[in-house]
Amino acid sequence: LFDYFRTEKVSLNRLLMGEDFYHAVLDCYHLQYPDMVFSDFLWTMRSMYLPLFLTLSMEIPRADVYHAVATGYAGILGCMGKHFYPSQLIISEHGIYTREREEELIKADWVQRLYKKIWIQQFKKISQAAYHQADIVTSLYQQARELQIELGKKKKKTMVTPNGIQYHRLENL
């Protein structure tokens, strides 16, 4: 996908409204979601893939190291950089992106209950792609590290970098 979006002058409107996307969504619908209203499913897929395709359409500058503060779309940009240039990708998560999006979606009124699972799966796939490409993934505490491993990052490529603020040194300021 990275190469496709870089070498082709992709019209996102033409892509999302085109026959190929329509048939891919239709196939997915028949295989996994035949009980949903198709028009709602199609528009959900379009709205779900638009931000990903916008991200994939971005120009990424050459760098030796890419650093993302989350696995989401920032992580995808880091993956793109690593794909196009000989480089490293570091992800420093203060929270676990997938879990944060899952919590937001569960509480969200704007997403129909039927579609929450699909959105959560999408964010999980994006995170897994970033974890797969990252050279190192850091977290602030051990439980977050364990979630990163559970979501697919190899244990030896994770580490805890605790918040290094020494509060006692700042108490009198």
Where are the language model's segments positioned?
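Donor nucleotide-sugar binding/catalytic pocket of nucleotide-sugar-dependent glycosyltransferases
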Residues: L26-H30, D35-F53, K117-N172
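Short, well-ordered alpha-helical microsegments
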Residues: A74-L77, R145
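A short acidic, amphipathic alpha-helical/loop segment
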Residues: L77-G81, N172
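A generic structural signal for well-ordered alpha-helical segments
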Residues: G81-K82, A130
